């Protein structure tokens, strides 16, 4: 999908992503509360800034929906310990960050009166690489770990091995399924290793996946969250 906010844009075709964010709200609010508990009390002489990163933030209303949910969790659960919240919105450099930044003014005008002070920055780059200094992030959120870091090497030969499909389906050869499963294991292991280095001790992650309800990887709609 394209950038901007036109008919074919991601912003206009992301209802499933919105559903995933709202469905994971209880887990996200729990994670915010747990991460908030890690912060030093005000008056300790040290900073009370919580760092939150949305990995694969996209562009459009869902990007700021995650921000809104995090801030809403502070308003409802974390009133006793004052805090500032630093958000990093991460996606590939090709993401339409300009659309995100243009929507910030309207978002700020509609903010909740009980939200803590917050700051939003864009962070272009792949989440399959280092993004933050050691032990610097309190909470990671991502909906995008279904996306692989690359096409498996054995599928780059030019031969069409998954003809007629844009993802794994009933007619996908078992050899192709195996290659993507191996790529997932490689990517997920790398992702967890990187985030482990970047998370503060006892930091939190909320990772939402889209898959199939059926245990058969070749059958069923790709809409199970």
Task: Please report, for each region that a protein language model flagged, where it lies by residue.
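N-terminal charged/capping segments associated with class I S-adenosyl-L-methionine
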Residues: 1-135, 148-172, 207, 212
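Alpha-helical packing segments of well-folded alpha/beta enzyme cores
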Residues: 24, 66, 184-191
């Amino acid at each position: 999908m394209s950038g901007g906010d036109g008919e074919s844009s991601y912003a206009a075709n992301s209802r499933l992503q919105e559903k995933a964010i709202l469905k994971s709200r209880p887990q996200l609010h729990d994670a915010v509360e747990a991460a908030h508990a890690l912060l030093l009390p005000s008056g300790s002489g040290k900073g009370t800034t919580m760092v939150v990163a949305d990995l694969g933030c996209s562009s459009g209303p869902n990007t700021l929906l995650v921000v809104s949910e995090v801030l809403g969790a502070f308003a409802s659960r974390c009133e006793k310990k004052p805090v500032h919240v630093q958000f990093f919105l991460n996606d590939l450099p090709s993401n339409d960050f300009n659309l995100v930044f243009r929507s910030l003014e309207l978002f700020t005008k509609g903010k909740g009166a009980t939200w803590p002070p917050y700051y939003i920055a864009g962070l272009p780059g792949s989440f399959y690489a280092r993004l933050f200094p050691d032990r610097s992030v309190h909470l990671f959120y991502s909906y995008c770990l279904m996306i692989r870091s690359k096409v498996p090497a054995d599928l780059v030969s030019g031969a069409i091995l998954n003809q007629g499909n844009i993802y794994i389906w009933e007619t996908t050869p078992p050899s192709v399924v195996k290659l993507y499963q191996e790529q997932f294991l490689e990517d997920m292991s790398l992702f967890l290793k990187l985030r482990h280095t970047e998370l503060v001790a006892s930091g939190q992650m909320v990772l939402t996946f889209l898959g199939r309800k059926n245990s058969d990887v070749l059958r069923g709609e790709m809409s199970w969250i």
